[in-house]
Amino acid sequence: MSLMILSVDGVEFAYKSRQILNNIKFEVKRGEVVSILGVNGAGKSTLLKCINKILKPKRGTILIDNFDIKNLDNLELAKKVGYVPQRAEGNYMTVFDAVLLGRKPHIKWEVSDRDIEITHKVLKLLNLEDYALRYTNELSGGELQKVIIARALVQEPQILLLDEPTNNLDLKNQLEVMKIIMDISKSQNIASIVVMHDLNLALRYSDKFIMLKDGVIYAEGGREVINPENIKAVYGVDAYIENVRGIPVVVPIG
């Protein structure tokens, strides 16, 4: 089995005459957590939507497990990619049923014992068993976010795409959600690609970083790319990096 699960090569995307992504090229290995960083409007969410075929690039190639996504129908893609959107709202549906919906790509005629088993397994993994019969519109933001991640996980994906998964969460839930993403990526050999605004959360839980600026990759690599020079260039903010108990912390200046 190849370690490489995602290859993005020369991807470009534009809204009418406005170029959003330009010659995007990178690769992701199984088990990696990759943070996509940059200011609002840099193209981060657009990139995730291109990988998930929500948007169609005007040029470039995206391979998932060596399959060109252009040749995958929505059902085939949903078996390979789990997508957690930026915003999720609860509704009058139990947590169990909301998570079970993620099995839709695998269900043929009716819900199988395996579908039920996997749903229970993922609920347990995310400590959601006690919430199974609660309605999603009764949940807190952090609880609902875990339900949406659980729904993506029951798809048994090879890749998780998460668009600002810690948005609107308190500090405790931010840490818990990111630790869940990191632990699941390692234990299940899933590649997780996460759009992030919080550099310190990204540094704490990610293996690799892709910094976008004006629709192009400005910097890519490990923790070494999160440095004062790149932060200044990408965000326009002066900062220094402090090491706290082995964890690098970005400290803005002024």
Curated annotation (Swiss-Prot):
Disulfide bonds: none annotated. The keyword ATP-binding applies. InterPro entries: AAA+_ATPase (IPR003593), ABC_transporter-like_ATP-bd (IPR003439), ABC_transporter-like_CS (IPR017871), Metal_Ion_Import_ABC (IPR050153), P-loop_NTPase (IPR027417). Keywords: ATP-binding, Nucleotide-binding, Transport. Residues 6-239 form the ABC transporter domain. Belongs to the ABC transporter superfamily. GO terms for cellular component: ATP-binding cassette (ABC) transporter complex. ATP binds at G38, V39, N40, G41, A42, G43, K44, S45. One of its GO terms (molecular function) is ATP binding. This is Uncharacterized ABC transporter ATP-binding protein MJ0089. It comes from Methanocaldococcus jannaschii (strain ATCC 43067 / DSM 2661 / JAL-1 / JCM 10045 / NBRC 100440). It holds the Pfam family ABC_tran. The keyword Transport applies.
